Structure formats: structure tokens, C-alpha cells
Design a protein with these regions (language model features):
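Structural microenvironment flanking redox-active thiols in thiol-disulfide oxidoreductases
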Residues: 74-134
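Hydrophobic packing within well-folded, soluble alpha/beta domains
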Residues: 58-61, 101, 144, 175
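Transmembrane alpha-helical segments of multi-pass membrane transport proteins and ion-pumping complexes
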Residues: 2-14
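Divalent metal-coordination and catalytic microenvironments
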Residues: 5, 50, 114, 144
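C-terminal structured "cap/appendage" subdomains that terminate the fold
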Residues: 1-3, 22-23
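Extracytoplasmic thiol/disulfide redox context detector
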Residues: 11-90, 94, 149, 153-171
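Solvent-exposed, acidic/flexible segments
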Residues: 57-61, 91-98, 107-111, 123, ...
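C-terminal cap of thioredoxin/glutaredoxin-like
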Residues: 53, 69-70, 131-192
Length: 192
């Protein structure tokens, strides 16, 4: 009887898998959330997860920070917000440098102190500016400088960007809600 039940269950799931249309490339988040890797605000076990692929030099990403703050205020502990890098170097020549700087700050627990500074002053992302923001964010500058040039930091930014490319993303900001790509406006009303 248990063998028959197993066989029927297996057949049912195989048939429904074949009847279900596959999720198109770019509509599903390919890398699961990794608390030890990702930049996260909110409880790890929150029922809602909002992942943003963004670029510190992108004016739309800068404007979206206000929307994200409103969404976080609306959902409170029900929401986990995750930032991932997608520097669009073709149009934002300082974006990768800014992403690397945020990763160097993150190694000191200062990602969410550094990111708002770079968004606020995104027209000023030359190295002397970035070091000033790191200082304002409370980073140890000698360690920041060392980490900034480390392979670990560069690989972290490249990993996010490669994930974005595999998902066929082409613009920032791009949001995923509970693992599925958000289509539509990225203002707070559209995300709520």
C-alpha cells in the first residue's frame, strides 16, 4: 500500500511539474538570501522579503530610498529588505567604485551608514569624496583602504552583478518581492 501511495504521489508531482509553465528568466531571484553575505535590514524570519538590485550612482535608486523607507515603516518587522549591487558602468562610471566602497564599509558593519551618504552625494563619488564618506560613516580609514583593494570586496560586487546579468536585468532599481520580480512602479504605493 505504501509503495502504491508513493508511486501515485511521484506520478502526480511529475505530471504537475510538466504542466506548470517554467518561470521566465529574470522573473525569479536566482540567489537565495544569505544572511552572512547579504546586506539586510529587518528580521531574518520576516514573512516578506524585498530585494533591491541597485547602483549608487543611479538617480532612480537614490529616489527609491525614500520609497524603501516608507515600505519598511509600513510593514515594520514583517519585512526584510536586502540590497544587492548592480553597477551600470556604461552610464555610471563611478558605480563600481562606490559599490566596492560600500563593501569595504560593510566589513566594518557600516554598510547602512555608508550607503545613504553615497546616495545623498551621488554626483560626488571621486575617491577623495568616498574616503570622506567612509570617515563620516565611522569607518577605520586604514582598514577601509586595505579592504577596498581586497579581492574579497571586488568579488562580492562582481558576484551580485553577475547574478543580475544571469537574470537578464537591465535597469536599476530592480526589485524582487518574496523571490519574484516586481513589475510596475517602485514608489511606496507600488511596492506596498
Amino acid at each position: 500500500a505504501s509503495v502504491i501511495a508513493f508511486a501515485l504521489g511521484w506520478a502526480f508531482f511529475r505530471i504537475t511539474d510538466r504542466l506548470s509553465p517554467p518561470v521566465a528568466v529574470g522573473l525569479k531571484l536566482i540567489r537565495p538570501i544569505e544572511p552572512e553575505r547579504d546586506h539586510i535590514r529587518g528580521p531574518a524570519d520576516a514573512p516578506l522579503t524585498l530585494v533591491e538590485y541597485g547602483d549608487f550612482e543611479c538617480p532612480f535608486c537614490s529616489r527609491a530610498t525614500g520609497s524603501i523607507d516608507e515600505v519598511r515603516a509600513h510593514f515594520g518587522d514583517e519585512l526584510r529588505y536586502v540590497w544587492r549591487h548592480f553597477p551600470l558602468e556604461r552610464v555610471h562610471p563611478r558605480a563600481t567604485d562606490a559599490a566596492r566602497a560600500s563593501e569595504a564599509a560593510a566589513l566594518q558593519g557600516k554598510f547602512f551608514d555608508m550607503a545613504p551618504l553615497m546616495f545623498r552625494f551621488q554626483d560626488h563619488l571621486e575617491w577623495q569624496d568616498i574616503y570622506r564618506y567612509a570617515d563620516q560613516a565611522g569607518c577605520d580609514i586604514a582598514r577601509f583602504d586595505e579592504d577596498l583593494h581586497s579581492p574579497r570586496v571586488l568579488h562580492r560586487v562582481e558576484d551580485d552583478a553577475q547574478d543580475a546579468e544571469v537574470m537578464d536585468l537591465n535597469a536599476t532599481p530592480t526589485f524582487f518581492v518574496n523571490g519574484l520580480r516586481h513589475k510596475g512602479p517602485w514608489d511606496s504605493a507600488g511596492l506596498i
